[in-house]
UniProtKB/Swiss-Prot annotation:
The lineage of its organism: Bacteria, Pseudomonadati, Pseudomonadota, Betaproteobacteria, Neisseriales. Part of an ATP-dependent transport system responsible for the release of lipoproteins targeted to the outer membrane from the inner membrane. Such a release is dependent of the sorting-signal (absence of an Asp at position 2 of the mature lipoprotein) and of LolA. It is a multi-pass membrane protein. Keywords: Cell inner membrane, Cell membrane, Membrane, Transmembrane, Transmembrane helix, Transport. The chain crosses the membrane at residues 24-44, 273-293, 324-344, 378-398. InterPro entries: ABC3_permease_C (IPR003838), Lipoprotein-release_system (IPR051447), LolCE_TM (IPR011925), MacB_PCD (IPR025857). This is Lipoprotein-releasing system transmembrane protein LolC. NCBIfam families: lolCE. Coiled coil: none annotated. It comes from Neisseria meningitidis serogroup A / serotype 4A (strain DSM 15465 / Z2491). PANTHER family: LIPOPROTEIN-RELEASING SYSTEM TRANSMEMBRANE PROTEIN LOLE.
Length: 415
């Protein structure tokens, strides 16, 4: 059963207003709250989806964890395996060397990170080896100086399978004429497509033995790339991987460390968007204050009569708090329903407008993906609803308190 104050407050909310403008302001405030809640849910859902998709893309092309010697005193990469063997959660490990270089072909030059790999082991730690547009990892034959390029890099260089490209390394050769760059011809034997624009435009792989020759290494490796059963558990697993006594000679890092700056930037953007869009709800709550103040002014005679019948100032305050709170509740409810429905279907909505207008809004060269992902988090929805209801409740305090201070004699003097 509703209390008297709640019953009167709901009756005031449903009653036809004598002042049409006041009714309009009330509807605007409810619509404003609904719009703010909808926008906040949709934006956070898109950012959640974007973060989830990019995390999935990165985990397909990047190692889940890496391990290596700090000073490279031990040149046998198999000795590193003792840290990973019989470890629950580690599925595979592959050695690698890595260094910077320039690739040149047909007058085009691009900066790249050349990775020396062991084909039989590399296939075990990355997903894209089975979906190469041309060639395969096993085409990298030691001593042949073969190279596999990302599709974007190959396109930028104008290189195709079978072409030779020139690799220019940072280390130079000392000649009587001075120091000149070291040049080496490599044959393109394959193309790889990871789906991540940045990787596809900078990735170059060769056999680990050829990479050692190119960079004048002995038997050193940069480290091991690891594939984990549960990448989300990478920080906890890597923290226990190296014994305390050997942490000054062996380093280990996981994918969250390697991509920390990116994910921190996305998380910061999410927080800032949350704050900015919450202001929309706050502005709508201020409209709720205006509508309640006007309602208090219109109901002065009613308030005075209720007071003379024995209703306490606190009871009067509750009436208008109920009226305002239910306005906020209806706005929040409408916003949650619209936000969740739109959040679930925002990809289809964007695709519809792209087809209708003949434009492509999501550029994969900028955003890694060419569609708008969405992941509605019910925890975010609950938080947004609570904030909206809280702001709506706060908005009722001043008008309700003002109504409670109404003096019956003053209010009825001119009635």
């Amino acid at each position: 059963m509703f209390s008297l104050e709640a019953w009167i407050g709901l009756r005031y909310l449903r009653a036809k207003k004598r002042n049409g403008f006041m009714s309009f302001i009330t509807m605007v405030s409810i619509a404003g709250i609904a719009l703010g809640v909808t926008a906040l849910i949709v934006v956070l859902s898109v950012m959640n989806g974007f973060q989830k998709e990019i995390r999935g893309q990165l985990l397909n092309v990047a190692p889940h964890a890496e391990i290596g010697y700090i000073d490279n005193t031990d040149t046998d990469w198999r000795n590193l395996l003792r840290f990973t063997e019989n470890r629950k959660g580690i599925l595979a490990a592959a050695p690698y060397v890595s260094n910077q270089a320039l690739l040149a072909n047909a007058g085009e030059i691009r900066g790249v990170q050349i990775r020396g790999i062991l084909p039989s082991e590399e296939r075990k730690v990355v997903e894209y080896g089975d979906k190469m547009p041309a060639g395969k990892f096993e085409d990298l034959i030691p001593g042949e100086f073969d190279i596999i390029l990302g599709v974007g890099l190959a396109e930028a260089l104008g290189a195709e399978v079978g072409n030779k490209v020139t690799v220019i390394t940072p280390e130079g050769n000392v000649t009587p004429a001075g120091v000149v760059p070291r040049l080496k011809q490599f044959t393109v034997v394959g193309l790889v497509k990871t789906g991540v624009y940045e990787v596809d435009n900078s990735l170059a792989m060769t056999h680990i033995q050829d990479a050692r020759v190119l960079y004048r290494l002995d038997k050193e490796v940069a480290g091991l790339r690891l594939k984990l059963a549960d990448p989300q558990n990478a920080p906890a697993l890597t923290a226990k991987l190296i014994p305390e006594a050997q942490r000054d000679t062996v380093w280990v890092r996981d994918w969250t460390f390697s991509n920390r700056s990116y994910f921190e930037a996305v998380e910061l953007e999410k927080r800032m968007m949350f704050i900015i869009l919450t202001l929309i709800i706050a502005v709508a709550a201020f409209n709720l204050v205006s509508s309640l103040v006007m309602a208090v002014t219109e109901k002065q005679a009613d308030i005075a009569i209720l007071r003379t019948l024995g209703l306490s100032p606190g009871g009067v305050m509750k009436i208008f708090m109920v009226q305002g709170a239910f306005s906020g509740f209806f706005g929040t409810l409408a916003g949650v329903v619209c936000g969740v429905l739109l959040g679930w279907n925002v990809g289809r909505v964007v695709a519809f407008f792209e087809n209708l207008l003949g434009v492509h809004l999501i550029n994969s060269q900028v955003y890694f993906i060419d569609y708008l992902p969405s992941d509605v988090d019910m925890g975010d929805v609950a938080l947004i609803a609570c904030i909206s209801l809280g702001l709506s409740f706060v908005a009722t305090l001043y008008p309700s308190r003002r109504a409670s201070k109404t003096q019956p004699a003053e209010a009825l003097r001119y009635e």
